[in-house]
Amino acid sequence: ELDPFSGKIVVQKNGKKFVVQNQVPFPLSQEEMDAIYDLDYVRTYHPSYEKYGGVPAIEEVQFSVISCRGCFGSCSFCAIHSHQGRIIQTRSHESIIREAKKITELPNFKGYIHDVGGPTANFRHPSCAKQLKVGVCRDRQCLFPKPCPNLDTDHSDYIALLQKVRALSGIKKVFVRSGIRYDYLLADKNDRFLDELCRYHVSGQLKVAPEHVSEHALANMGKPGKSVYLKFMRAFNKKNQEIGLKQFLVPYFISSHPGCTLRDAVELSEFLRDIGHQPEQVQDFIPTPGSASTAMYYSGINPETGKKVFVARNPHDKAMQRALMQYKNPKNRQLVKEALQQTNRGDLIGDDAKCLLKISSSHNPKARHSKIAFNPKINKRR
């Protein structure tokens, strides 16, 4: 009922009272968006924070520009599409340029715009013309499980916007850091945006969010399959080779998402091994209000399919999934060992190149005193 065109008022009895959810408003027009962002904001934290030494991360926000609102990505673990809507609302180029010029006048501005984006940076218009006439589809999503045939994947407006901002006097570089949907980028048959992105708007590393590689884990997340990420990874690397730049992808992954089993976590760790990536930070799933994933976490049922899903609620189970993503960390050895034993993956313990847990002294200085071996009697499946 979150669609302004077809959504209804929802009433739920709660004791002797009723909870009423009114019909959601229509998306903001471009004129309304411009009016909001043209207000005279001070672009810094409240003076009360001075006694605490200020806010260290203020620059990331202070020198960033919001260009759009809403998201039609509909990831299961995200509630942005619920409270900002699936219909994209955008600011005009003129409004964004006015703000960028104001940023260049700030005393501590060093020439770098940290971001021009939003919930998803490369969503700069509604996903299809139909949305502005009859609303969003009630029985399907725009990008999952595959991009809709009616999806408008044209990136030309966003390209033109970035070109205008980076051409402004006083601006050395414009980055795109709020995240892009690489499946949406790949759906655009014209690779001009990828070329512009790699040439001008990556700060050496581009953060993307494949979230997982197990197909059924991704299905519960509402994310594209592993093959889509691999296709983007190849396209990104090829483009950077063409333009002579050394730039890298930094993929984000989630552990213990509802529907993700210990076997799925092992599959992810093997993928990380194969691409030579060890994440410094790992996002363990946290149930947050308003998301489908939270409903799965508490009910054990995927609300979209009605099917039961495995949920890792036990702290130890969650710790094993998390440890597998950082299997090279010495602190995680015991957890990784236990996880591999429980999934009957003793083939990943040893000194072979494919092994996640090394046992030789060259890899483990303490190996002589704490020998790790596979126990075939332990074969618990999750």
Language-model segment annotations:
Residues 64-76, 86-95, 99, 103, ...:
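Cysteine-centered iron-sulfur cluster-binding motifs in ferredoxin-type domains/subunits
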Residues 102-250, 254-258:
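Conserved SAM/AdoMet-binding glycine-rich loop
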Residues 1-61, 328-330, 337-366:
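Flexible, acidic/Gly-rich N-terminal and inter-domain linker regions that tether
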